[in-house]
Amino acid sequence: MLILISPAKTLDYQSPLATTRYTQPELLDHSQQLIQQARQLSAPQISRLMGISDKLADLNATRFHDWQPHFTPDNARQAILAFKGDVYTGLQAETFNDADFDFAQQHLRMLSGLYGVLRPLDLMQPYRLEMGIRLENPRGKDLYQFWGDIITDKLNEALEAQGDRVVVNLASEEYFKSVKPKKLNAELIKPVFLDEKNGKFKVVSFYAKKARGLMSRFIIENRLTKPEQLTAFDREGYFFDEETSTQDELVFKRYEQ
């Protein structure tokens, strides 16, 4: 079973590390090509392209400039411990033990605009380059064209290595668009999290993102390998709704708190 999640905009390079183990990202040659493109942008251009403040644009221009492909624990951090958004609040990787990291390294993948695919212990230098950004590059007009089949091929390699054919899509639409489902050698399962609001169940972005992290943690902690095991997910008040679920879309609901 392979879990896919999105990265986060918020990064943490200060907190104590939960593990000193690390691996190197596998697609750095491609990342380097994107960095070369990004370095051609001025801070105002970055601000317009990403829709961010001048201060953030300056920070990211500096990050692009400082980025270099020789990653060490001194200039980089394990991806699963560097990302700090809503998904990662639910995941709480900083509390993983060695066995959790082992399982996650085999069964969890983070999709990334700059790095393509990251394993949890892959070192990562700080960046901001969302998958949906229209950064022109030698392969096309945006990052989807840049990555082409590369991300899908990497995921197929991971599936081959673990010997099963199930992908649990907990990534956002923006990021999952970088995967080509027809070329993915797997059964695709998408958990959906609905929260009750004024008597109606709907996707509430903040809660849904955190729930994706909670589900990822649930799979990792319990070493789940079969799709039917996912329906037991009951963290923070969610319950499986069999009636509205299908074979490839599992619906979890939570009553208003």
Curated annotation (Swiss-Prot):
GO terms for cellular component: cytosol. GO terms for biological process: response to hydroperoxide. Pfam families: H2O2_YaaD. NCBIfam families: PRK02101.1-1 (NF002541), PRK02101.1-3 (NF002542). Belongs to the UPF0246 family. This is UPF0246 protein YaaA.
